């Protein structure tokens, strides 16, 4: 299994971990599909204009956007946690996003999903 043959998806690419992972993946020879809720924020990253980076807008809470984002990828890094969620709904919101990632990844035939736990 050659994970470099297709792009890898990085969710939460505008966040602390995602923003630092993208350049590491590029240095290792991967093509990256960087997912964020705002393409403008993705473009503003130092790697936003890199020729091996595809910018994608989406939200892990929206299954359709996750299904589209995972298509054609070999693997996905799930680096999103619901920091903006109401404290009373944090767990539910976080669970829904993770479930969407897993289902979209299975439907797209991803070889791996790498999950950043708490």
Please give the residue ranges for each predicted region.
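Structural motif
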Residues: 7, 74-75, 112
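Glycine-centered flexibility sites
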Residues: 12-18, 58, 72, 97, ...
